[in-house]
Amino acid sequence: EMIQKQIQEMLDHQSIIRTSDVVKKGIPKPYLNRMVENGQLIKVARGIYITDWSQYDEYAIFQLQHQKVIYSYLSALYLHGLIDVIPKYKEVTVYTGYNPHRFPKEVKRHFIQKELYEVGVTKLQTSFGNEVRVYDLERSICDLIRERQKIDVEIFSTSLKRYIQSSKKDLRKLYKHAREFHVLENVQSLMEVLYE
Protein backbone atom coordinates (compact mmCIF):
# COMPACT_ATOMS: atom_id res chain seq x y z
CA GLU A 1 0.00 0.00 0.00
CA MET A 2 2.70 2.42 1.06
CA ILE A 3 4.68 1.73 -2.11
CA GLN A 4 1.64 2.11 -4.36
CA LYS A 5 1.03 5.44 -2.70
CA GLN A 6 4.61 6.47 -3.51
CA ILE A 7 4.14 5.50 -7.15
CA GLN A 8 0.83 7.34 -7.23
CA GLU A 9 2.54 10.46 -5.88
CA MET A 10 5.07 10.24 -8.70
CA LEU A 11 2.23 9.97 -11.20
CA ASP A 12 0.60 13.09 -9.80
CA HIS A 13 3.69 15.02 -10.90
CA GLN A 14 4.60 13.25 -14.13
CA SER A 15 2.52 11.44 -16.72
CA ILE A 16 5.35 9.09 -17.71
CA ILE A 17 7.23 6.86 -15.28
CA ARG A 18 10.47 5.03 -15.98
CA THR A 19 11.66 1.93 -14.18
CA SER A 20 14.80 3.90 -13.31
CA ASP A 21 12.70 6.60 -11.55
CA VAL A 22 11.05 3.94 -9.41
CA VAL A 23 14.32 2.16 -8.61
CA LYS A 24 15.88 5.50 -7.57
CA LYS A 25 13.14 5.84 -4.95
CA GLY A 26 14.03 2.39 -3.61
CA ILE A 27 10.83 0.79 -4.91
CA PRO A 28 11.24 -2.84 -6.07
CA LYS A 29 10.58 -3.37 -9.81
CA PRO A 30 7.90 -6.09 -9.35
CA TYR A 31 5.52 -3.40 -8.08
CA LEU A 32 5.38 -1.94 -11.58
CA ASN A 33 4.40 -5.33 -13.05
CA ARG A 34 1.74 -5.70 -10.38
CA MET A 35 0.30 -2.29 -11.25
CA VAL A 36 0.28 -3.26 -14.95
CA GLU A 37 -1.59 -6.48 -14.10
CA ASN A 38 -4.10 -4.49 -12.03
CA GLY A 39 -4.65 -2.08 -14.92
CA GLN A 40 -3.22 0.88 -12.99
CA LEU A 41 -0.29 1.28 -15.39
CA ILE A 42 0.28 0.65 -19.10
CA LYS A 43 3.71 -0.44 -20.29
CA VAL A 44 4.37 1.48 -23.52
CA ALA A 45 8.02 0.61 -24.09
CA ARG A 46 10.87 -1.11 -22.30
CA GLY A 47 11.07 0.51 -18.86
CA ILE A 48 8.44 3.17 -19.69
CA TYR A 49 4.91 3.34 -18.25
CA ILE A 50 1.88 5.62 -18.41
CA THR A 51 -1.44 5.58 -16.55
CA ASP A 52 -3.73 6.13 -19.46
CA TRP A 53 -3.57 6.07 -23.28
CA SER A 54 -4.71 9.68 -23.26
CA GLN A 55 -1.29 10.45 -21.74
CA TYR A 56 0.62 8.81 -24.61
CA ASP A 57 3.14 11.50 -25.53
CA GLU A 58 5.01 10.09 -28.53
CA TYR A 59 7.63 12.86 -28.57
CA ALA A 60 8.60 12.44 -24.92
CA ILE A 61 8.43 8.64 -24.96
CA PHE A 62 10.58 8.34 -28.10
CA GLN A 63 13.21 10.62 -26.58
CA LEU A 64 13.24 8.60 -23.35
CA GLN A 65 13.95 5.51 -25.46
CA HIS A 66 16.65 7.24 -27.54
CA GLN A 67 18.28 9.80 -25.29
CA LYS A 68 20.78 11.14 -27.82
CA VAL A 69 18.15 12.36 -30.29
CA ILE A 70 17.33 16.05 -30.55
CA TYR A 71 14.12 17.09 -32.27
CA SER A 72 14.94 19.09 -35.37
CA TYR A 73 13.57 20.32 -38.71
CA LEU A 74 9.77 19.86 -39.00
CA SER A 75 9.49 18.31 -35.53
CA ALA A 76 11.27 21.31 -34.01
CA LEU A 77 9.14 23.77 -36.01
CA TYR A 78 6.01 21.96 -34.84
CA LEU A 79 7.10 21.89 -31.18
CA HIS A 80 7.93 25.62 -31.38
CA GLY A 81 4.49 26.32 -32.89
CA LEU A 82 5.84 27.61 -36.21
CA ILE A 83 3.75 25.05 -38.10
CA ASP A 84 0.30 23.83 -37.13
CA VAL A 85 0.09 20.47 -38.84
CA ILE A 86 1.55 17.55 -36.92
CA PRO A 87 4.34 16.20 -39.15
CA LYS A 88 3.74 12.72 -40.60
CA TYR A 89 7.05 11.56 -39.16
CA LYS A 90 9.35 12.63 -36.37
CA GLU A 91 12.59 14.33 -37.40
CA VAL A 92 15.64 14.07 -35.21
CA THR A 93 19.32 14.93 -35.35
CA VAL A 94 22.10 12.78 -33.95
CA TYR A 95 25.86 13.16 -34.25
CA THR A 96 27.85 11.38 -36.95
CA GLY A 97 28.98 8.00 -35.70
CA TYR A 98 25.95 7.50 -33.45
CA ASN A 99 24.34 4.19 -34.30
CA PRO A 100 20.57 4.64 -34.20
CA HIS A 101 19.62 0.99 -33.86
CA ARG A 102 15.96 0.09 -33.49
CA PHE A 103 14.73 3.37 -34.96
CA PRO A 104 11.22 2.98 -36.37
CA LYS A 105 10.77 3.70 -40.10
CA GLU A 106 8.64 6.76 -39.42
CA VAL A 107 11.57 8.62 -37.90
CA LYS A 108 13.68 10.74 -40.23
CA ARG A 109 17.30 11.01 -39.10
CA HIS A 110 19.79 13.77 -39.75
CA PHE A 111 23.47 13.40 -38.92
CA ILE A 112 25.76 16.27 -38.01
CA GLN A 113 29.38 16.39 -36.88
CA LYS A 114 29.75 16.22 -33.13
CA GLU A 115 30.91 19.84 -32.64
CA LEU A 116 27.69 21.19 -34.19
CA TYR A 117 25.35 18.64 -32.60
CA GLU A 118 24.86 20.59 -29.34
CA VAL A 119 24.57 24.04 -30.98
CA GLY A 120 21.23 25.58 -30.04
CA VAL A 121 19.88 22.72 -27.92
CA THR A 122 17.05 23.81 -25.66
CA LYS A 123 14.18 22.24 -23.74
CA LEU A 124 10.51 22.66 -24.53
CA GLN A 125 7.30 21.31 -23.07
CA THR A 126 5.12 19.20 -25.33
CA SER A 127 1.35 19.72 -25.33
CA PHE A 128 1.27 16.98 -22.64
CA GLY A 129 3.54 19.01 -20.38
CA ASN A 130 6.57 16.73 -20.71
CA GLU A 131 10.00 18.18 -21.38
CA VAL A 132 11.86 17.30 -24.60
CA ARG A 133 15.19 18.37 -26.07
CA VAL A 134 14.79 20.33 -29.27
CA TYR A 135 16.85 22.80 -31.28
CA ASP A 136 16.02 26.44 -30.59
CA LEU A 137 14.13 28.59 -33.07
CA GLU A 138 17.31 30.04 -34.55
CA ARG A 139 19.02 26.71 -35.16
CA SER A 140 15.77 25.39 -36.64
CA ILE A 141 15.58 28.33 -39.06
CA CYS A 142 19.23 27.76 -40.09
CA ASP A 143 18.53 24.05 -40.66
CA LEU A 144 15.51 24.97 -42.75
CA ILE A 145 17.57 27.32 -44.90
CA ARG A 146 20.37 24.75 -45.26
CA GLU A 147 17.90 22.15 -46.52
CA ARG A 148 15.69 24.58 -48.43
CA GLN A 149 15.63 22.43 -51.59
CA LYS A 150 14.04 19.54 -49.69
CA ILE A 151 11.49 21.55 -47.69
CA ASP A 152 7.91 22.13 -48.79
CA VAL A 153 7.61 25.74 -50.06
CA GLU A 154 4.56 26.54 -47.94
CA ILE A 155 6.14 25.19 -44.76
CA PHE A 156 9.30 27.15 -45.53
CA SER A 157 7.56 30.50 -46.00
CA THR A 158 5.07 30.05 -43.13
CA SER A 159 7.86 29.16 -40.71
CA LEU A 160 9.97 32.15 -41.69
CA LYS A 161 7.05 34.58 -41.48
CA ARG A 162 6.04 33.25 -38.08
CA TYR A 163 9.61 33.43 -36.86
CA ILE A 164 9.80 37.10 -37.87
CA GLN A 165 6.51 37.79 -36.04
CA SER A 166 7.54 35.83 -32.94
CA SER A 167 8.31 37.75 -29.77
CA LYS A 168 10.77 34.98 -28.89
CA LYS A 169 13.04 35.55 -31.89
CA ASP A 170 16.66 36.48 -31.31
CA LEU A 171 18.26 37.83 -34.48
CA ARG A 172 21.71 38.06 -32.94
CA LYS A 173 21.56 34.38 -32.12
CA LEU A 174 20.21 33.66 -35.61
CA TYR A 175 23.23 35.31 -37.24
CA LYS A 176 25.60 33.56 -34.82
CA HIS A 177 24.14 30.15 -35.72
CA ALA A 178 24.08 31.11 -39.41
CA ARG A 179 27.81 31.79 -39.26
CA GLU A 180 28.47 28.43 -37.59
CA PHE A 181 26.48 26.61 -40.27
CA HIS A 182 27.85 28.65 -43.20
CA VAL A 183 24.47 30.05 -44.27
CA LEU A 184 25.02 33.66 -43.20
CA GLU A 185 24.55 35.16 -46.67
CA ASN A 186 21.37 33.17 -47.30
CA VAL A 187 19.96 34.18 -43.92
CA GLN A 188 20.82 37.85 -44.45
CA SER A 189 19.24 38.02 -47.89
CA LEU A 190 16.07 36.25 -46.68
CA MET A 191 15.79 38.58 -43.70
CA GLU A 192 16.15 41.62 -45.96
CA VAL A 193 13.29 40.38 -48.14
CA LEU A 194 11.08 39.56 -45.14
CA TYR A 195 11.73 42.87 -43.41
CA GLU A 196 10.95 45.03 -46.46
Question: PLM features: residue spans?
Answer:
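Short amphipathic alpha-helical interface segments
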Residues: M2-S15
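Charged, low-complexity surface patches
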Residues: L11, K24-K25, Q65
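Nucleic-acid-binding surface
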Residues: I17-D21, V36, V44, I48-E196
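Short amphipathic alpha-helical interaction segments
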Residues: K24-E37
